[in-house]
Amino acid sequence: MAGVSASDIKAHLFHEGRLYESYRFFGAHQTEQDGRQGFRFCVWAPHAKEVRIAGTFNGWSGVLHRMEKRHQEGIWELFIPGIGEGELYKYEMITAANETKLKADPYAFFSEVRPKTASVTYQLAGYQWGDRKWQKKKQQKAVYEKPISIYELHIGSWKKKADGRFFTYRELSETVIPYVKEHGFTHIELMPLTEHPFDRSWGYQTTGYYSPTSRYGEPHDLMYFIDQCHQHEIGVIMDWVSGHFCKDDHGLYLFDGMPLYEYKHEHDRENWEWGTANFDLGKREVHSFLISNALYWIEMYHIDGFRVDAVANLLYWPNRPQPEANGFAIEFIQTLNEQVFAKDPHFLMIAEDSTDWPLVTHPTYEGGLGFNYKWNMGWMNDVLTYMEASPEQRKHLHHLVSFSLMYAYSENYILPFSHDEVVYRKKSLLHKMPGDYWQKFAQYRLLISYFMMHPGKKLLFMGGEFAQFDEWKDEEELDWFLDDFDMHRKARMFTKEALHLYKKSRILYENDHRQQGFEWIDVNNAEQSIVSFIRYGKQPGEALIIVCNFTPSVYHEYRVGVPFQTEYIEVLNSDDAKYGGSHQINPKRLQARKGVLHGKPYSISMTVPPLGAAVFRAVKKRGAKKG
């Protein structure tokens, strides 16, 4: 169209909510104009009377660099020649009330180290990625049929230097990656890395959505960390907060003197619980900002997945006496997921949703929200409630370990033992377990066993792998000294071996989302607090038999029904002495005997360990009979 510039087209798409690479248009970009190198700045501030750029290059005097209002809807631009990377800057907003506000760039690629708040000019291009093999392998199989075991990591408190300083992204790559690889995790989930002013918000109160926090280094350092993860066959998931943002003066809040990124009306805008502001998802420009942000992390940082935080906060209007669905947010979520999967069909879009909203992990064309995974908060709450009860009381709570299978296939689930469950006096997983010292560890191993054998992908927060006794202390490193204690060291060995068993056992992940992949053997043995079930593989004769005993009693010659007339080998027993148990194991192969039991045509007799789990693999034999 004659007279319409590329800039005009991008502005039009931005206002329609369809500029999905808005980070290439807005922000600070190194470029050349009229033969001179410099940076082009662009910002959306429709309510401002004037916008200037103040920074180290002009003595923080914005009057020297007044931006031009290029578009009627409030997009301001300016090219400043002669400046390079590493310059500090802010937008100097002259509001309609003639107030002056200094604001960080919403699209800044880099920021000053807190408590300082300026944006930093930075050239993202130039990092040489070495993860082509990972990217190719990722496309070869649907995520649903892959093992997914996630190590949830808070970079600032995994380990700290002797003087209390943080390790950098690059430094952590030398320790975290081998550790995660050794233990058999398939993914690392990083708690939010977007820039945030307050350490103890853990990153959930963001000011810089396009800026990885400078606490741990520069953007290229984070790229290096992710690249190294990929080269060691570890995927990287990032916590992503799209519902609300930090209200600090330099951030998005009242950006140009008026509500811009947030809702206009106070009862919609204010998130009283967290002290933040809710994004106005009715604004198309906010759609462009957030969807572009998701695609930015995929394109520029090769992120493999998002755990989308606080989806319930998106789905329902805040501050209402009764739950009221937010149609703007539903449309936003559906569009977000459609655009992400158009970019990468094998991406992980994980909803952290505590509600019973239907079809969360169903495609948008079926009326679903379009995620491909959802945290199973119901399972987590039920199982932890059950495990915190004394063994004597568990027979009265038996439904808590069985109810999850009533809905396990209604969505695609991840089973989460996350940071939320081991903080704010909730106690660590180990400390939640009742009983004496030995019993706590036995029940920890039993909990991990049930977690690993139950349908659903897995997530475990750091420190859970070695049964840290204290809950998470976000200003300190993990209690690594516990590895000097025998029971903690053995707990870590058990978790590691359970994770590796999961990773190498197709039975435990290929049929995760198919009802034919699971069958109860005996779900009704409340009196003894024992559950037994089968995990089936895709191939004929593939099966694991799992028996979990939630009391301290030992049962010898305990018989359960099995589907195949073959031998069964114990592949994991949480009571093995090498894990700190009492060694009530089944060292010999168990031969199936003909005779109906639990609705199965054959049965095996075993020793059931106290406060423990035993897992048996059916030996595939040519001509083995199935009932």
From Swiss-Prot:
Its EC number is 2.4.1.18. InterPro entries: A-amylase/branching_C, Branching_enzy, GlgB, GlgB_N_E_set_prok, Glyco_hydro_13_cat_dom, Glyco_hydro_13_N, Glyco_hydro_b, Glycoside_hydrolase_SF. GO terms for molecular function: 1,4-alpha-glucan branching enzyme activity; cation binding; hydrolase activity, hydrolyzing O-glycosyl compounds. Keywords: Carbohydrate metabolism, Glycogen biosynthesis, Glycogen metabolism, Glycosyltransferase, Transferase. It catalyses: Transfers a segment of a (1->4)-alpha-D-glucan chain to a primary hydroxy group in a similar glucan chain. Pathway: Glycan biosynthesis; glycogen biosynthesis. It comes from the Bacteria. Catalyzes the formation of the alpha-1,6-glucosidic linkages in glycogen by scission of a 1,4-alpha-linked oligosaccharide from growing alpha-1,4-glucan chains and the subsequent attachment of the oligosaccharide to the alpha-1,6 position. PANTHER family: 1,4-ALPHA-GLUCAN-BRANCHING ENZYME (PTHR43651:SF3). This is 1,4-alpha-glucan branching enzyme GlgB. The lineage of its organism: Bacteria, Bacillati, Bacillota, Bacilli, Bacillales.
